[in-house]
Amino acid sequence: MPQPINISASRAAALLGQSEYQTPVSVWLQIMEARDPGFCARRGYILPVIEYTPAMRWGHAFESAIVELASAEKGTPITDREKFFATSGAGEYSRTPELSLERGHFLTCHIDGLYIGDDPPSLHEGKTTSEFYYHTHFGDPGTDKVPPEYQIQCQHQMICTGAERVILSVLVFPKRVEEWEEMGYIPVKSENGVWRIDNEKFINAIDPIEWARTLAEMGFFHQYEIHAHPELQSKMLTRYREFWEVNVLGAREPEPQSMDDIKCLCPSPVGTVVADESIERMLYERESIKSEISASGALGKRVEQIKVATLDYMRNAGAVIDDESKDKWLLLSRDGRKLASYYRDKRGYYIFR
């Protein structure tokens, strides 16, 4: 599927530092490659691979089912499914990709649907999740207590459409979708676009709407109301414009935030670099705490931050290739001691030590 060339709703959380799956660098690389095919190859970057995960597959399979449940819950038809909207945040909107390009509207979204009859209009947004994730990340139904990335996605859609409310409908599965697939339940899309759930143990496929209705009867369907938040939207627009003008139009890399960012921006690290005082201090800090931590804790995240900051420094410091660093990055202290190295081993794994 072609990637959007603008800031879409699914990318919004990444630009605000609220995504578990994307970073500003990965979003930037996707946008730049979509706008200018071959951009990554010319710059020596690697385009991030977007994996079609089981969560995505199940989400797509149950989209229509959630629309039916949401429409029945409110007693209002839902229309304009997958309708395109775009804006630059100045109160003018486009409803086709062609018009958005003509007007320079760089914020886009495809809505899941629009409730007929609401004035001002209310948007429909559907989600699927597991029972464990639901109970650890959502608040009481009827409130706006949803994960930050969903809140941001809804605010983005309201920016793009001018709507003032999103009804977020959540279908909860008692198990993770990976567990359902391990049990043999696989969502399959037919040639005419109709989804079904196949299982080789059964003769007939399962219609997602029948499954969804059963879950709803068991209390696994919930709705949340997300209202337009002008202050948050203003901050989002400020960040969007900075990213668009500096990073996209200016073709400047965002600051890397993860080891995956470093791998994409510099897939073939070579050369020797001399650390400055701040990098030396960070590496000493890393050595002092890494033996006492777990990777998931606050100190573990700090160690990861130090690694990323060190490698970003090495990437921009003007490395000199010598006999010892012709196949790796080598970081030396100001007095010539070896502080760290970074290289790709024979299996293709990147090693920092």
Briefly describe each language-model feature range.
Residues 1-353:
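Accessory terminal regions of nucleic-acid processing enzymes
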